Amino acid sequence: MTTKYQAPLAAGWLIRAPSLLSPTQRHWLFRPGALTAGLRQLGKVQLRVVSEHAEGASLDEARAMLIAPGSPVWVREVLMSVDGIDSVPARSLTPLAASHGSWQGMRRLLTRPLADMLYHDRGVTRSPFVCRRLSSPLPFYRMALPPNHDGSAIWARRSVFWRHGQPLLVAECFLPDFWRKVTLGRAIPPLKAHDRRA
């Protein structure tokens, strides 16, 4: 997989992790390759589909995908747990027409991760990662905020995959319980060969 030029940044997104974050946080926010592969090095990963639906693209997400705000998009929201601990909510979206075309596989994943269709296709390119602290009114914030949130910062990353000129925006955030888990274990697992792809 090759890396594509990043679209103009939407407000709040950063091309580098701020210095206030720990090395472990910076590692996970900009870790290359499939995130699920990294999570599996920490424990048993389970994926639950929270929602699949059509909506209008927000200004923030539309800018990342180079489409007009309000354009119809297909959204898939999931929650990944590690050893039973809710760890990583993820939100993926693509133009509605692309969900029946270039990215139609997104509709057939069920409980399989997006990596199953992204990292085996040489025709797919990906933008560099950007990160930010989640806040309202971002759509991802409403989905990702855990019921027992203690007020601590929730950091997210996102990138855009491109196939046949069609974007697929993938955002992932790391919940406070995830950081507690990696702090207790090996905070920065070594990358395996198949994880080193950009």
Swiss-Prot record:
InterPro entries membership: Chorismate--pyruvate_lyase (IPR007440), Chorismate_lyase_/UTRA_dom_sf (IPR028978)
Binding site for substrate: R76, L114, E172
Entry's EC annotation: 4.1.3.40
Entry keyword annotation includes Translocase: no
EC top class named in words: lyase
Keywords from the UniProt entry: Cytoplasm, Lyase, Pyruvate, Ubiquinone biosynthesis
Recorded GO CC terms: cytosol
SUPFAM superfamilies named among the record's database cross-references: Chorismate lyase-like
Pathway note: Cofactor biosynthesis; ubiquinone biosynthesis
Cell compartments where the protein resides: Cytoplasm
GO molecular function annotations of the record: chorismate lyase activity
Keyword Lipid metabolism: no
Protein family (similarity comment): Belongs to the UbiC family.
Name used for this protein in its record: Probable chorismate pyruvate-lyase
Lineage: Bacteria, Pseudomonadati, Pseudomonadota, Betaproteobacteria, Burkholderiales
